[in-house]
Amino acid sequence: MGKLTLLLLAILVWLQYSLWFGKNGIHDYTRVNDDVAALQATNAKLKARNDQLFAEIDDLNGGQEALEERARNELSMTRPGETFYRLVPDASKRAQSAGQNNR
């Protein structure tokens, strides 16, 4: 009976070692779970960005407001009868902000 108990104990130790330290053991399992969580977070961010880009594409394809906004912002276009005003800070504020940017 003693040899059988010793054999079963040796098998139990070997199985526990395999479970904790072997290939596909607990350490590998937790590492893979951490990797999966990080990749899922990255995928969620990328999906949100893709959804935003698809919404912008739909707006550009069908909506005139987005086209008008881009023309106004990027090309400085105005409608007939409108006057475009550009506000330029005075020289002292420009010099002060330039001094802060050089720091």
From Swiss-Prot:
ATP-binding is among the record's keywords: no
Cited Gene3D superfamilies: 1.20.5.400
GO CC entries: cell division site; cell septum; plasma membrane
InterPro entries: Cell_div_FtsB, FtsL/DivIC
Localization, UniProt: Cell inner membrane
Keyword Transmembrane helix (UniProt): yes
Domain of life of the source: Bacteria
Coiled-coil regions, chain positions: 28-71
Topological domain spans for side Periplasmic: 22-103
Keywords tagged on the record: Cell cycle, Cell division, Cell inner membrane, Cell membrane, Coiled coil, Membrane, Transmembrane, Transmembrane helix
Principal place of residence: membrane
Annotated transmembrane regions: 4-21
Residues in compartment: Cytoplasmic: 1-3
Bilayer disposition of the protein: Single-pass type II membrane protein
Listed GO biological process terms: FtsZ-dependent cytokinesis
Xref: NCBIfam families: PRK00888.1
Family: Belongs to the FtsB family.
Summary of the function given for this chain in its UniProt record: Essential cell division protein. May link together the upstream cell division proteins, which are predominantly cytoplasmic, with the downstream cell division proteins, which are predominantly periplasmic.
Subunit composition and interactions: Part of a complex composed of FtsB, FtsL and FtsQ.
Protein name stated in the entry: Cell division protein FtsB
Organism of provenance: Shigella flexneri
Lineage: Bacteria, Pseudomonadati, Pseudomonadota, Gammaproteobacteria, Enterobacterales
